[in-house]
Design a protein with these regions (language model features):
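Conserved C-terminal "switch" segment of AAA+ ATPases
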Residues: 204-222
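Short, mixed charged/polar active-site loops
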Residues: 18, 223-227
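Phosphate-handling catalytic cores of nucleic-acid transaction enzymes
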Residues: 255-262
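P-loop NTPase catalytic phosphate-binding loop
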Residues: 1-103, 122-123, 130-191, 200, ...
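Conserved beta-strand-loop-alpha-helix hinge in the C-terminal portion
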Residues: 195-196
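Short helix/loop segment immediately N-terminal to the Walker
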Residues: 100-121
Length: 265
């Protein structure tokens, strides 16, 4: 499908004609991609689609590469080590706080999630995760892993979701069963046998390497691995411009709502 057809609604994000990420039911996405696999475009496509909803996003790009450029057009984009660590902590605190306040809300019902209470989902989009972990001291690593573990275990109900991307999902940095908490896993571009087994576990499947940008394999949370093609980005599509436009629209909308609420409309 083309990127205009990538739409998020009712806790589900459509990514291919027959592939959606049902983040409300099967939370957290893990993306692995070798160079030239189309990983960055795929992440930008997700950001653009989620901006059309009421989702709140936080973008972490420790290599200060393409995603860091988004800081020109949207808030909550970080690339410095300290800022990234602080953002993870804020995201975690926000999740814990929401879990508490949800229980006190009028419409709260046991077993219902954030969407039932009309709260917006929050997404922490973390590129080059392995590269980031390699920059940290042992102590810092433990603190970050602890927070991420809590987020993947507790985030679904409160609507706090993690999208983690890396070149290859090194077991060293996705240990302690944290990898299994990522229900939607996509491997883009060419990966080694080891890369695939780190991504999908030990599977009896032959992976064919076709030289097509944006092609890979996906497990949508059903433990069935199928071929995957990232949404097509038309030539000349300017993500920065489009994301900036959507961000502006959103701010204008909020300003209008604010004015209305203040009775100045």
């Amino acid at each position: 499908i083309t990127i205009d057809e990538v739409q998020a609604a009712h806790g589900s994000l459509k990514l291919m004609a027959n592939v959606s990420w049902e983040y409300d039911k099967l939370p957290h996405m893990l993306i692995a991609g070798g160079t030239g696999g189309g990983k960055t475009y795929f992440i930008l496509t997700i950001i653009e689609a989620l901006l059309r909803t009421n989702a709140q996003m936080y973008v972490l790009d420790p290599k200060n590469a393409d995603l860091a450029d988004l800081s020109a057009v949207m808030p909550e984009v970080y690339y410095r080590k300290e800022d990234i660590t602080a953002c993870i902590e804020r995201f975690y605190d926000g999740m814990m706080e929401r879990s508490e306040t949800m229980k006190l809300m009028d419409g709260y019902k046991t077993g219902e999630n954030y969407a039932y209470l009309n709260l917006p989902p929050h997404f922490l989009i973390f590129d080059e995760y392995v590269a980031f972990r390699e920059m940290l001291t042992t102590k810092e690593n433990a603190a970050v892993l602890n927070k991420l573990k809590q987020i993947v275990m507790l985030g679904r109900q409160a609507g706090y979701f993690l999208i983690l991307a890396c070149q290859r999902p090194d077991a060293k940095y996705l240990g302690d069963g944290i990898r299994d908490q990522f229900n939607f896993r996509v491997a883009l571009g060419r990966m080694s046998e080891l890369g695939y087994s780190m991504m999908f576990g030990e599977v009896d499947k032959d992976f064919f390497l076709k030289q097509i940008k944006g092609r890979g394999y996906v497990d949508v949370g059903t433990s069935v691995i199928s071929e995957f093609y990232t949404p097509l980005v038309p030539k000349g599509h300017d993500f920065l411009k489009e994301i900036g436009r959507l961000m502006q629209q959103r701010q204008d909308g909020q300003a209008a709502c604010g004015a209305k609420a203040a009775g100045t409309d």
